[in-house]
């Protein structure tokens, strides 16, 4: 995760597993507070940088390059989808829709992933 560029240096255990209450967060402000509490403030700063692409991609509708941020894996979306969509580079994925494209975007493994407890349990049952 750190080799991929994520700023999660003070976290000891990865992936991050949180309570199911995180699925009920509906406001981006509350989600940003959650990031700061678990020590991902530098990660938020990293993904907020947007650069202008070099070359002709600007003319073809791909003007900005954005960084890939954390992925939230949940069992059901009770409002967290609306909170996460306002943070550039972050995604929410239900367990049944989880694929390699979410976990390793651009074929680069090691995305910072935040699982809920019920999502981990459901992953174990699916196998």
Model-derived regions: residue spans:
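Extended polybasic, low-complexity segments that bind anionic RNA or targeting/receptor surfaces
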Residues: 1-127
């Amino acid at each position: 995760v750190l080799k991929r560029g994520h700023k999660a240096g003070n976290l000891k255990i990865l992936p991050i597993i949180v309570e199911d209450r995180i699925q009920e967060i509906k406001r981006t402000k509350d989600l940003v507070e959650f990031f700061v509490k678990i020590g991902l403030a530098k990660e938020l700063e990293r993904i907020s940088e947007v650069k202008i692409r070099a070359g002709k991609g600007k003319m073809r509708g791909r003007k900005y390059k954005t960084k890939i941020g954390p992925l939230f894996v949940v069992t059901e979306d009770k409002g967290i989808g609306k909170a996460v969509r306002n943070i550039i580079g972050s995604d929410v994925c239900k367990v049944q829709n989880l694929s390699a494209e979410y976990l390793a975007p651009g074929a680069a493994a090691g995305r910072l992933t935040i699982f809920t407890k019920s999502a981990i349990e459901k992953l174990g049952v699916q196998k």
